[in-house]
């Protein structure tokens, strides 16, 4: 899986696709743990649909990155995405920011 990325110092931002579901979950998880940076921000603003497989891929990626000394944080201003994170209580596991810039700055 290839997704658009941006690098800000030791942080890489990954922009997710419109759908993050079962078809994309394995590829997303593999991508996130093989990046050249260990501090990752996942930008969910373009994502309209995310299911349990997609959420699990994010959670597993965060766990793997933390084992490697990094972290994974989320950025989204989209209310439906924020609601899903709240309903699944993943907003307690992840640091969730309104903007990519705020998420990147949190690593400093």
What is each residue range found by the language model?
Residues 1-15:
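Short beta-strand/loop segment at the start of cytosolic alpha/beta domains
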Residues 5, 91-94, 104:
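Generic intrinsically disordered, low-complexity segments enriched for polar/acidic and small residues
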Residues 8, 45, 101:
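Conserved catalytic submotifs in the C-terminal HATPase_c
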Residues 16-20:
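Short, flexible loop segments at the rims of nucleotide/cofactor-binding pockets, characterized by
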Residues 22-94:
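Amphipathic alpha-helical interaction surfaces in cytosolic regulatory modules
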Residues 96-108:
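A charged, well-structured terminal subsegment
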